[in-house]
Amino acid sequence: MKKQGLVWCLAATLATAVGAQELKPVILPAPQTDGGRPLMQALKDRKSTREFSGEKLPVQVLANMLWAGFGVNRPDGKRTAPSAMNWQETEIYVVTADGAYVYDAAKNRLEPVAKEDLRNLAGTQSYVATAPVNLVYVADLTKVTGDAGEKELFTGADTGFIAQNVYLYCASEGLATVVRASVDREALGKALKLKATQKIVLAQSVGYPKK
């Protein structure tokens, strides 16, 4: 009986440990849509920065930034950035030290994708692996019509709108950011469990500036 009890105890401990490692959805706080610097000041302060401190972004800041990038800003589900034909084909993957998530704008939450730290796959530059947050912009090509060239044009432009929104939010809040095309697309796509019809367009590192 003692042996059987020990086995059950070990099994329960293992199950608890495994459960603790599982990522759970993150319910984001409502975005704060008031305040911030005036638009002209944010445009003046907008810049690319490639050095980050190790400080994590508070969840409220993350929620605000994702909403600014491509959140829902109208009752009809339309977004803060335009997309051709209102396809809304771009998904934002959020890669952090704690794991990787995909932003669900309609529900204002992060859905878990991978529990590993994938930041080293989110870019080829050394600073990418230490930036607190790497946003990976992924286009769902099943939502886009046209030939290959047209799809590339549409998805590139739509992603650019989102990245600029993030730039302006970061300028408004004193955050450091840089958008990048250099991504290990094959390795990162596999780690993020992307489908063949999903294409990584750009990535963007975000954090507090290094002091």
Model-derived segments and their meaning:
Residues 1-8:
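Bacterial N-terminal signal peptides that target proteins for export
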Residues 8-17:
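Bacterial N-terminal signal peptides
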Residues 32, 137-141, 208:
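Short, small-residue-rich loop/turn micro-motifs
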Residues 46, 65, 92, 133-144, ...:
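Small-aliphatic-rich amphipathic alpha-helix that forms the alpha element of a beta-alpha
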